[in-house]
Amino acid sequence: MVGLKTQNDLEIALRQNKWLGEILERFEEVALPDSWLVAGCIAQTIWNLGHGQPAEFGLKDVDLIYFDELDLSFEAEASHERRLRALFQHLPIKLDVKNEARVHLWYEERFGYAIKPYLSSADAIATFPPLQPP
């Protein structure tokens, strides 16, 4: 398995994925508050590297979250997603963009129970289910 001991080790590993590497290289252009790459794109890349696969193998999408409590509208979230998909349209992967500040507005309808509003992206990430190896 890939030896990851520091944040720098993780970033070096993720940059071996040419798609994530480009997103990270241009992350200032994402220009969203409290924004993070999260979930399967990270786990899949690390799994791939640890098992001798190309870093991009099996990636279906890239999840990018942000936290903007000042605009909880679906329209703003959709607009950011369109902008970022256009920015990275040359990459052969789907980009999913979500405002974690608005998750509580739709969570109950989708999952059957209500949640409290998150306080930050880190607060939201702390509730993510553990990822299973591919």
Segment roles from a protein language model:
Residues 81-128:
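Conserved catalytic core of two-metal-ion nucleotidyltransferases
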Residues 47-77:
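Catalytic metal-binding acidic patch
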